[in-house]
Amino acid sequence: MRPCRSLRTAALAVVLTVLLHPVALGRATPGESEQNYLWQRRYECYASNGTQRLLDRCAYNREEFVRFDSDIGEFRAVSELGRQVAESWNLEYLQQARAEVDRVCRHNYELFQGLPVLLQTQPRVSVSPSKKGPLQHHSLLVCHVTDFYPGHVQVRWFLNGREETAGVVSTHPIHNGDWTFQILVMLEMTPHQGDVYTCHVEHPSLDSPITVEWKAQSDSARSKMLAGVGGLVLGLVSLAVGVFMHRRSKKAQQGCR
């Protein structure tokens, strides 16, 4: 099984997680009762202020049972299942585990530090009201920024070109489950006809900011716009059908000559 590596950032620390043999599925040996099991081993590296800390964590059926912490310097049981394992590994593998700080953590940290561009993912941005309602009624406008890495992002709201700072509520960056993040930034508003709200997003992966607009429209104006779009589409379809029939008729006439 190939190693799987991922780089994460956290407040005041860069966390490098290296999954070695992340999932091992097995079955009981012949003669024993048939039962599947899950074995996991994960190396976590924390880099802060020039120091490296290694956590070597082992889990059986998703429950951690033994752990090596380089700050402590030995394997320790996390559950009853890990007591004998910790004693055995401290006798057999302790020096090797202590050496992993340099082999796994420091080496991979320096490797990824040299590839900052590869560790940047551009965000996707969408804007929508929290609920539909008439104009001049209090509401929330939500700017959803997702799939970005690293986790630092700046999101600002503008109304008709002027920045809005009052009534802005934001979540903290949320992990998506891979190495990317998402964030919700909400603006309290009372929209009027013609108002233009703009979500302005700045991120290290972007050469220039992303801006997404939301225009306040009454239901009647929105209906007229949709009717206009529908009429335009219908007209284009009719034109295409007419051109097709004309060409078909022309070919038929040429074939009769």
Curated annotation (Swiss-Prot):
InterPro entries, sorted: Ig-like_dom, Ig-like_dom_sf, Ig-like_fold, Ig/MHC_CS, Ig_C1-set, MHC/Immunoglobulin, MHC_I/II-like_Ag-recog, MHC_II_a/b_N
Start and end residues of each stretch annotated as Beta-2? 121-214
Q: Which residues form the signal peptide?
A: 1-29
Q: Where in the sequence does glycosylation occur per the annotation? A: 49
The record ties this protein, via PROSITE patterns, to: IG_LIKE, IG_MHC
Source organism of the structure: Oryctolagus cuniculus
Q: Which residues lie on this side of the membrane: Extracellular?
A: 30-224
List, alphabetically, the CDD domains matched: IgC1_MHC_II_beta_HLA-DP (cd21003)
State the residue spans of region: Beta-1.
30-120
Q: Which PANTHER family match?
A: HLA CLASS II HISTOCOMPATIBILITY ANTIGEN, DP BETA 1 CHAIN (PTHR19944:SF46), MHC CLASS II-RELATED (PTHR19944)
What UniProt keywords apply to this chain's record, in alphabetical order? Adaptive immunity, Disulfide bond, Glycoprotein, Immunity, Membrane, MHC II, Signal, Transmembrane, Transmembrane helix
- What SUPFAM superfamilies does the record tag this protein with? Immunoglobulin (SSF48726), MHC antigen-recognition domain (SSF54452)
Q: Which SMART domains match?
A: IGc1 (SM00407), MHC_II_beta (SM00921)
Q: Which residues cross the membrane?
A: 225-245
Taxonomic lineage per UniProt?
A: Eukaryota, Metazoa, Chordata, Craniata, Vertebrata
Keyword check for Cell inner membrane = no
**Domain Ig-like C1-type residue range list:** 123-211
Biological processes annotated in GO: adaptive immune response; antigen processing and presentation of peptide or polysaccharide antigen via MHC class II
Q: Which family does it belong to?
A: Belongs to the MHC class II family.
Q: What's the protein called, per UniProt?
A: RLA class II histocompatibility antigen, DP beta chain
Principal subcellular localization? membrane
What GO cellular-component annotations does this UniProt entry give? MHC class II protein complex
- Region listing for Connecting peptide, in residue ranges: 215-224
Disulphide-bridged cysteine pairs: 45-105, 143-199
